[in-house]
Amino acid sequence: MLKFLLLFFLIPFYSYSGCEDGDCNNGYGTYIWFNGDTDTRGWVEGDKYVGMFLNGKMHGQGILYFKNGNIYNGSFHNGSKSGYGSLIYKNGEKYLGNFLNDKKHGTGILITNNGEENNIRYKFGVKFKDNELF
């Protein structure tokens, strides 16, 4: 019975979201989301961030590895993707451009799997074509 109780109380400590390495408060660290946890930004179980933190939030340069296979490498501000970054999709396509509050914003380049480069403009995550929404 004692073994069961000990196991019952120790399991939560092995499957929590949190700082896995370094200083995830005000420095450089690794933060991993586990145990089905999500946060208000939508990071989910299996996502991992490696980079700079300020006041416990992603801030500065970092890399965000998504569980779905996508990878964002770039600037963060106050916990969200903001500034210049690259988003590499699991299908091999790449977006290089600006982000604001976790959304593509401003000009960028989409590089397809066959190497074709397309200039793209976004406004708060909405794609523009010929200066008009579509």
Please report, for each region that a protein language model flagged, where it lies by residue.
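Glycine/tyrosine- and acidic-biased, solvent-exposed loop/turn segments at the edges of beta-strands
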Residues: 12-134
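Absolute protein N-terminus
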Residues: 1-3, 17-18
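Sec-dependent N-terminal signal peptides
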Residues: 3-13
